[in-house]
Amino acid sequence: MRSIRMWLAVLAVVVAGASRASAQERGFVVIVNDANYLTSVSTAELNRLFMKQTVRWTTGQAVTAVDLKSDSPAREEFSQSVIGRSTAEVKAYWQNVIFSGRGIPPMEAPSEQSVVQFVRTTPGAIGYVSATTPLIQGVRAVRVRN
């Protein structure tokens, strides 16, 4: 029984390390408020959240997506790998949406620390930061599935 617990502990450490390593390979980490139930999210789901096609979590709480400033390397990588467009193309899309009166883009934070603080204080928030950004209590990373 004790060896099974030891094996499970080792496995948990390996899986956690692999999850963080894969996030670092991406260059960004998706973060949510600790009160959020989310443990993993697909790139398709992220796309819908950040393009505001999904506006509520399954709990009914409003989704509040927050982007990094447009000149951030993590934002460019997020835009390319999740949205499938460059940051400039995403901004052009949102300008068209705003002009036509169909919506507004996610809030844009000036720094990674601002994203972390916003997500920590906003229960329905989801954001992303570079993989090297330290996370604080009240915020946790979620695994991104392809």
Locate predicted features.
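Positively charged n-region of N-terminal signal peptides that target proteins for export
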Residues: 1-5
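Bacterial N-terminal signal peptides
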Residues: 7-16
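Sec/Tat signal peptide C-region and signal peptidase I cleavage site
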Residues: 18-23
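Exported/periplasmic ABC-transporter solute-binding proteins
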Residues: 24-146
